[in-house]
């Protein structure tokens, strides 16, 4: 009799088990992507095509942001050196500058106006140095905003704003990719952005509508700026303005390139009413000197000046009416903290500017003869080194000197006429 086959084991599937690759339907699981860089600027960069570094006049250089206030418009431009790998090695590319708000980006821990290579600070009038609420951009979620500046902003030569001109196609492709990503997210928020974004509806909205709103807001802001509702364009100092500045009290004046330090406050020197601070560059540019932000940090506030100075009223002279003229003399001290990130820059500035007048090139002033001496000796100062010639040779090359009445006062003698015609003959 045949042996019966053993019963087949029955296995019940677990609903929680994951099917194997052979049983799984649909596309295979994709590899996890690395986390995107979350320290990217909100704005497109500025490409530098020359040796001149990026620089903006005071009060300029902050990209337009539809959601920012003047107090928030402060930050830094950071240079990014680029290179490309070729068959013969690496080839450097034109550097590109990107803007970040204060307290954000790769230099988030850098104090406002700190000196560092490849970093320039910009701010609008009325901006504060507080860390910004705008954070940085996640390129996987949001496209870059094309950099735009307020009317009147002076962009250095050989700089190109990315996203304009030849880059319009790439910007369009980036917008379409971002639009498809945004529609699949269904309004998810950007975890890398802190608190706020320059986009008018925050992060995660459909890019088409968001971009249109940004353009409308920027257009309105540009119209307000042109109409004078926003920040005014930098004022050009004219001769009339300089003359009006002279009417201000001396200690209330502001030296600029159009009304320099010497014009506003006088020559540098050791006198009791003179200042010994200022090199040639500072004397020429005043507050438009690129070093001015660091120089201004050394100046005390009005409260500190009045509260930390030694004062003394001194009598210097009398005016035209004989009334006494008094001056308020003061002296004080400022501690230079070596822990401050600008300490080395301060020492460099102080070393270059204190008593710099002593090394200025001296100009020789021509003394103008006064009174009768001007008529009798008009050109003696220019002829001092000429050797004295014999009498006859002097008559050969006679130089008529003196005023017109003097030249016509006398008539030459017969001997002078003969010597002039026949220089080798004897009278």
Curated annotation (Swiss-Prot):
Q: Where RNA is bound, by residue?
A: 82, 96, 137
Residues with Phosphoserine modification = 132
Q: Its family?
A: Belongs to the betacoronavirus nucleocapsid protein family.
Query: CDD domains from the xrefs?
Result: CoV_N-CTD (cd21595), CoV_N-NTD (cd21554)
- Protein location: Virion; Host endoplasmic reticulum-Golgi intermediate compartment; Host Golgi apparatus
Q: What is this protein called?
A: Nucleoprotein
Renumbered to this chain, region (RNA-binding) spans: 34-172
Subunit (UniProt): Homooligomer. Both monomeric and oligomeric forms interact with RNA. Interacts with protein M. Interacts with NSP3; this interaction serves to tether the genome to the newly translated replicase-transcriptase complex at a very early stage of infection.
Q: How does the record describe the protein's post-translational processing?
A: ADP-ribosylated. The ADP-ribosylation is retained in the virion during infection.
């Amino acid at each position: 009799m045949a042996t019966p086959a053993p019963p087949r084991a029955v296995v019940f599937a677990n609903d929680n088990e994951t099917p194997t690759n052979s049983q799984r339907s649909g596309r295979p699981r994709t590899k996890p992507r690395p986390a995107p860089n979350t320290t990217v600027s909100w704005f497109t960069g500025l490409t530098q095509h020359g040796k001149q570094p990026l620089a903006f006049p005071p009060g300029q250089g902050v990209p337009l942001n539809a959601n920012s206030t003047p107090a928030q418009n402060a930050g830094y431009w950071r240079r990014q050196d680029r290179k490309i790998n070729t068959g013969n090695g690496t080839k450097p590319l034109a550097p590109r500058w990107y803007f970040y708000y204060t307290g954000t980006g790769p230099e988030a821990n850098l104090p406002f106006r700190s000196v560092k290579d490849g970093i320039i600070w910009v701010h609008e009038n009325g901006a504060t140095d507080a860390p910004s609420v705008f954070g940085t951009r996640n390129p996987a979620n949001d496209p870059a905003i094309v950099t735009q500046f307020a009317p009147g902003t002076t962009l250095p030569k050989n700089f190109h704003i990315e996203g304009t001109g030849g880059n319009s196609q790439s910007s369009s492709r980036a917008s379409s990719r971002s639009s498809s990503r945004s529609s699949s997210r269904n309004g998810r928020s950007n975890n890398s952005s802190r608190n706020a974004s320059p986009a008018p509806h925050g992060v995660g909205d459909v890019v088409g509508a968001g971009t249109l709103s940004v353009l409308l807001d920027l257009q309105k802001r540009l119209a307000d700026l042109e109409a004078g509702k926003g920040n005014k364009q930098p004022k050009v100092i004219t001769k009339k303005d300089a003359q009006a500045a002279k009417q201000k009290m001396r200690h209330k004046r502001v030296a600029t390139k159009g009304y320099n330090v010497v014009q506003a406050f006088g020559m540098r020197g050791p006198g009791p009413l003179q200042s010994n601070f200022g090199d040639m560059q500072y004397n020429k540019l005043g507050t438009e000197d690129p070093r001015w932000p660091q120089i201004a940090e050394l100046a005390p506030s009005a409260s500190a000046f009045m509260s930390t100075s030694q004062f003394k009223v001194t009598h210097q002279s009398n005016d035209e009416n004989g009334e006494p003229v008094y001056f308020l003399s003061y002296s004080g001290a400022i501690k230079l903290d070596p822990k401050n990130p600008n300490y080395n820059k301060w020492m460099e500035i102080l070393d270059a500017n204190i008593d710099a007048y002593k090394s200025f090139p001296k100009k020789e002033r021509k003394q103008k003869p006064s009174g009768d001496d001007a008529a009798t000796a008009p050109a003696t100062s220019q002829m001092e080194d000429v050797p004295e010639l014999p009498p006859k040779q002097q008559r050969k090359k006679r130089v008529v000197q003196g005023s017109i009445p003097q030249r016509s006062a006398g008539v030459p003698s017969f001997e002078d006429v003969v010597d002039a015609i026949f220089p080798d003959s004897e009278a």
